[in-house]
Amino acid sequence: MAGTLYLCATPIGNLEDMTYRAVRVLQEVDLIAAEDTRNSIKLLNHFEIKTPMTSYHEYNKIEKGHKLVEKLLDGTDIALITDAGTPGISDPGEELVKMCHEAGVTVTAVPGAAACITALTISGQGTRRFAFEAFLPTDKKERQAVLEEMKNETRTIVMYEAPHRLVRTLELLADTLGDRGVSICRELTKK
């Protein structure tokens, strides 16, 4: 019988964001696939989780993804964790989930903190209808094309940006989208 891939949300700043269920699942699975094992070991040590860990990240997602699917098909239960938040949201976990669905492997969520939803709820912007854009492309033409698509968007737009690109991105948003409300959220749960 095939194993299950568990998408376990991890804290987005405060270790107390971790759910009891996520801790239990991480203790019970056979293997943890982590975006950055150096970062994840701190989380696992904090919760005294001894489960073996392997890396799964942007630069090995295809090759390692196939290996993980093979293990899952052989009956291994695997938890996927990201550095912060929910795997599959703006990270390589999306690719592994696709591979699992194609192979007929069960994928289940162990929900918890997600930066996009947390930011939306504290932003003061409309929450009834929203669009999530993740990170804008780094390629100038691709980025401008996405911004042009966003011009006619009437819903609240949630997006991520790296601190070193924030000012430039805000300038691009103002130039392209005009007069709109903006909320900047960071360090969402560290207190």
Residue ranges and their predicted role:
Residues 1-59:
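Glycine-rich, flexible N-terminal cofactor/catalytic loop recognition
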Residues 2-3, 114-191:
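Beta-strand/loop-alpha-helix module characteristic of Rossmann-like adenine-cofactor folds
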Residues 3-5, 74-79, 156:
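Loop/turn-to-beta-strand initiation segments
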Residues 12-15, 83-87, 163-165, 190:
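Short glycine-rich anion-binding loops that position phosphate/pyrophosphate groups of nucleotides
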Residues 26-32, 104-108, 156-157:
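Short active-site oxyanion
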Residues 54-63, 135-140:
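Conserved helicase motor
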Residues 58-73, 92:
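Short phosphate-binding loop-to-helix
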Residues 74-133:
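Short glycine-cluster motifs
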